[in-house]
């Protein structure tokens, strides 16, 4: 994970998981019992700060105590390997091994192809037959994450016996060996694990952003993980003892028939229900829970819970006794309200599903377990700046730069002193008439202040905004009078439209569109206003720019880091705005398709767009988001396929025209004759092949001894001839070398006073202009195809995150609303124009 404390995973632009909540490790580990891990899940795990295994420090990690299939020599393990792709590139190396005694028991070892992190290994054990036959309530074959992430944890059911019962300091943990961290476990006296034990894999991952991983009485910090990595098993013997102990304890606990997990499947977070177990591992149930209200709570606040139920007839005397409510890792008193109703207040808890039950002593449950959900606090829209000092100062800096550029780049004196063309004067008057509504804004602000309808801070913001609007109107009128020459930049190379886009001032788009200035104006780095709006995640600004005609398929100037440039979708993806990036990528492909259609390179329309316009109905929010994501992927895939087909067709036409240009009738006739010969030979190919095969079989069967002797004799004769020819060549070489030396010295040097053969230089052939132009075209086409592939990948990445689908849905609705507002604004502007003419 990144070190910024936000819990973002490294390499999110490759595997698609930005946070640990997106990765959902607990669900992934449950599903790993019945399926193999996906390449993007493996890449996300191996890229983080959580170290799984260091195969450079412990090279014998494959000697795990299992009996694997061997090669023919009987010593080496027979392993198959391949490379897995994450996206469009190979990034993971995987090795397979099958059991010798049990062929359905399989081991997979994964590590990254990246040289910087290739030493981290993830090992996955699974019995494929058990995963296909066992039910969802049983535990399948063991999954081994035998690495330094959890060095003091062996398995979920053995966690209380692996770690010491007393508090262990970081120094003690760093100095203990693997054998000292493990203690003998009595499998017969082992009790059924609780849900908290089963979820220990995900708790350290969720707490990794805070720098610690806690469980029970042991607290292991990130520094101790690195120390354990350095002080881990350094010999094959210690690692073998640890693996044998781990496998024996894991298998023993899994084969125990009394082990019945109390984990319920994850429910839909949008509609949680009170789900209980049909049976319980408790020897005798005292209290029967019928309802828990509420069924979920936010993880960052205290929550009051009402537990409703009834006591069994034989335990009615315990009605007013002191009971406890156990929720995850916390045990709080349960206050008696009335018969069968208890109230408790649970403290904040990390997000996830936990067990909730009543207990008499705070440990042993006396009721069935209820699955209670702690939800993460909803993240605010990324378009809204964070409420901290840095974001406020950054926004204020942009406002200062915009104000400075508007007030210092005025050319009123030059405009008034120069001769203004009638056309520019007429356009300036039109702009002034269309922007008269700003006077109404001033009047509304004065009335609001006098009537105390707005707060003081809102009044200041409105005043500042109106001042910028009026100054921008005057600035645009000056540029229209000058002939629309917008070459004003601030100290960092940004123009007015770029600063407005960075700040999210959507009102500036209407003024620029009315003035006739280009919305695709580039700054000194080649960025347009749409690039800046996408970079800062300004969804409303992006929608306004697209509605006003901004082009989403423009590319920034090339840099040393990115030779092909970046699109607006690439910039949004870099800052984590997946939904916005997918929407811009789709619009980029559609815009390029329409441009090529106008140019005559493509015919027809996109069928996906037609189907989307026809199939519009009312669906729930989640289904509508998924439907929009699927429609976007269909549109992007179809547009990319049509564009690539046009590229191939154009390249084929160019090759065909070049061939026709240099061809003549004689060559054409030869090609026709050659084609006829090929057709005639193809008709007789089958018969001739059978005859030749039969002849070769007969000859080899009859004369293989004679041929072998003949080949040996011929080989010896060839060697003798080669040796003789080499001897003659060496004799003649000395004579030729002496003759050339005499010729060079006598003739070229002494007589003609010139350089010898050593001074001869061959003139380099210069490339023709046509070849250079062709190379430039190929490079441009290759970069365009790469941009197409990136756009399709951006749209496809939405399916990895539900939040990205919701962001895409919100961006789509915002764009549709902006289009309606822009059309309404244009109609009002043209209506005023027609009324003035009348």
From Swiss-Prot:
Residues 738-760 are annotated as: Calmodulin-binding. It comes from the Eukaryota. Expressed in roots, stems, leaves, sepals, petals, stamen filaments, top of carpels, anthers and siliques, but not in stigmas. One of its GO terms (biological process) is response to salt stress. Residues 802-822 form a coiled coil. Belongs to the CAMTA family. Keywords: Activator, ANK repeat, Calcium, Calmodulin-binding, Coiled coil, DNA-binding, Nucleus, Repeat, Stress response, Transcription. It is found in: Nucleus. The gene is CAMTA6. Gene3D superfamilies: 1.20.5.190, Ankyrin repeat-containing domain, Immunoglobulins. This is Calmodulin-binding transcription activator 6. One of its GO terms (molecular function) is DNA binding. CDD domains: IQCD. PROSITE patterns: ANK_REP_REGION, ANK_REPEAT, CG_1, IQ. ANK repeats lie at residues 525-554. PANTHER family: CALMODULIN-BINDING TRANSCRIPTION ACTIVATOR 6, CALMODULIN-BINDING TRANSCRIPTION ACTIVATOR CAMTA.
